[in-house]
Structures are given as C-alpha cells and as structure tokens.
C-alpha cells in the first residue's frame, strides 16, 4: 500500500517526461513491451498518453499492485528465462523499453542479443553512468548509495554504450543525458559529518547553492558524465 501512495505523483513528475521524450524520437505509432516494469509507473504514463503497452516483471506482488492502477495496459509475471523468449517471439511490439533494468543483470548481453534477433524496431533504455555520483558514494560510504547499490552489477559510460550499439548493430536515434549528481552532493553533505546544528547547516547550504544547482548539473549533463542517460536505439539487423 505504501509503495503506491505516491504512484500518481511519480507518474506525473518522472514518467510522463520519459514518454514525451520517447514520442519526440519515435514519430510513428508505438506498441511497447516494457520489461522489468515494476509496479507499472511507465505503463501508466504511456496509458495516459494513449500508447498501448504490455509489461512484464519477475515480482508477482508488484504485478498485482500495478494492475490495480492500470486500465488498458497490463502487467504479467514472468521469470527472466521466459522474458528472453518473449522478446524474440513477440512481433506485435515495435518498441522495447528497459527502464533501469540493464544495470541489474549479470548477463546484459544475453538480453541485448535477444533484442537483436527480434523483429522489434526500437529499444529505449535508462541506465546509470560512471559519474560524479559514483565518486561521492565512495567518499561518503554512510550515505545511502543509488549507483553503487548492492543489486547493481553494471555501470555504463558513453564509450561502453557506443560499443554496445556497434556490437549489436544498433543506431542511437535519441539521447537524453540528465543526472542528479549535484543533488546527490547536497544530500551527502547534509547526511554526513559532525554537524552541530543540522537545521542551520542545511539552510545555509541550500541558500548558497540551490538557486544554481540546475546550472551546475547542466555542465555534467552537457558533457555526458552525469549519473544517468536515456537512449533510444534503432535495430538495424532487419
């Protein structure tokens, strides 16, 4: 229940912009397969934008929670071995989305190879990058990590993503570099060290830097060294 309390807010603030980005890149009608969809936030955003989509996740609990929020789009439970088959067999979808999925896999190449063999035209991914946030998490080990959390097996870079595109004959047709490195820095400074008066410390920190934190972050985003990236690939294997 608590997981879904902010469901609509997250859909509006986080996932609707992802759909808007995808629609700008892919001009034709989208039929989407969302793997690792969790409780279906992205599916709900797609639904609100009139896009037909089906989601799969390994968590039965999240599938049930998500379906309570969805009207047309649906979520199904499947283990990962079945998911590889789903990618290769489903011809009705023209877009595959992996939102925060590849970094959790021990064998991401297996999934990418299934996409390569499929007749799905587009691949939309969101992955974490080796970035300032990564260094912060090493320097502030007592602050909860987002990039180096225990269930992340991979971080990516611009170079490694270009390598994957070349290896699997994919063309990058859309990219959106947008990170949270400087908000992570603020969070790390606030939640560590011997601070005599945390309230005053936090107030001073935000008064000094919050007005131009977006400008600072934009420098990293522009140079493609931010904490995450959205990429859309076109499958050039058929």
Regions found by a protein language model. Give the residues of each.
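Short catalytic/ligand-binding loop motif for oxyanion handling, primarily in non-cytosolic enzymes
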Residues: 41-43, 132-135, 181-187
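A short His-aromatic
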Residues: 100-104
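A short glycine-rich, Lys/Arg-flanked "PGG" loop and its adjoining helix->strand segment in the class I
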Residues: 109-124
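Flexible, glycine-/basic-rich loop-and-beta segments that form/coincide
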Residues: 184, 191-197
